[in-house]
Amino acid sequence: MPVAVGVIQTDGFPAVLAAADAMVKAASVTLVSFDKAERAQFYVAVRGPVSEVERSMEAGIAAAEETYNGTVITHYMIPNPPDNVETVMPIAYSDEVEPFRV
């Protein structure tokens, strides 16, 4: 089963928190990264089956946009990312994430 990665970057912490919450509740995905991108921008990354990541991205974008002053800066999904992408980006399943892996 192909595994995808989906990333949403928002302006402000409440929007990314709402996105992360909606993403893991809307689909069977694993939250693999959640961090500050720059200044007041944050990003969240999830992994899972392609169809589940698509569904979680839709929910995350909607939740972030519904947040007071919430703005989605950008979003992207990579179906079946190659190993070298995992090597250079923080999207791999880490030891902290492994117990929650879906």
Swiss-Prot record:
PROSITE patterns registered for this protein in UniProt: BMC_1 (PS01139), BMC_2 (PS51930)
GO CC terms in record: carboxysome
InterPro entries with a match to the protein in the record: Bact_microcomp_CS, BMC_dom, BMC_shell, CcmK, CcmK-like_sf, CcmK/CsoS1_BMC
Keyword field contains Ubl conjugation: no
GO biological-process terms attached to the record: carbon fixation; photosynthesis
Pfam annotation, one family: BMC
GO terms, molecular function: structural constituent of carboxysome shell
Keyword line: Bacterial microcompartment, Carbon dioxide fixation, Carboxysome, Photosynthesis
Biological function: A probably non-essential, minor shell protein of the carboxysome, a polyhedral inclusion where RuBisCO (ribulose bisphosphate carboxylase, rbcL-rbcS) is sequestered. Hexamers form sheets that form the facets of the polyhedral carboxysome. In PCC 7418 there are several CcmK paralogs with presumably functional differences. This subunit probably only makes heterohexamers with CcmK4. Heterohexamers can also make dodecamers, formation depends on buffer conditions.
Subunit-level organization: Interacts stably with CcmK4, forming heterohexamers that can make dodecamers. Heterohexamers have a 1:2 CcmK3:CcmK4 stoichiometry. Upon expression in E.coli forms oligomers that could be dimers or trimers, but never hexamers; bulky residues in the pore region probably preclude the formation of homohexamers.
Name by which UniProt lists this protein: Carboxysome shell protein CcmK3
Organism name: Halothece sp. (strain PCC 7418) (Synechococcus sp. (strain PCC 7418))
